[in-house]
Amino acid sequence: MTEAELDFNNIEEVSNNFSFKFLNTGIMRDGNIYTVKTVPNYNGRKQLFKDIIIDSVEDKYFIEEDKFKEMKGSKRIKRISKTGHEYIFSEGTMSLIDDLNKPGRTMLTSEGTKNRSTHLIEVKKSDNDIKFRKLTPIECERLNGFDDDWTNTGMKERFRYFCMGNALVVGLVTKMSMELSNIIDKEK
């Protein structure tokens, strides 16, 4: 394992010059970043994104691709703060659509809005007709391990998205608690 120490004089220097190769697992402890490449020790069934997708949905879930291409694209924009400080706002490119053959990624509270983190999937209507759509509230519930319509309590749809973006993934918490329980039992 290699170790690197980065030293910056101020936040502006960090913002302008920070670059770091993060691997797929890591923590920050006492201001130090520890990152390693890990491989899951799991041989069971893996739920893929396509497993939670509903085949036929209302038209209101389909979106205009161009706006999302811009939002999910890379940016490097000079901005000025309220105090007059000039800085560079930058974001890297995100994939326009989510890969249905992989596990779904984390959902944010802004899921129901038009933003770069919104999950988009590609729907092939025919060979020449490919559309893009956002997830339905039920798909969001499934992605987090909740039952269908769990948030359908009469609240507005945007709040259903918010709830799922603010939720813990039930299956993940359950599996982690079982594993922690096993570790604790072995230590007794």
Annotate the PLM regions.
Residues 1-7:
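Domain-level detector for long C-terminal conserved domains
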Residues 9-188:
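C-terminal target-recognition/interaction regions appended to catalytic cores
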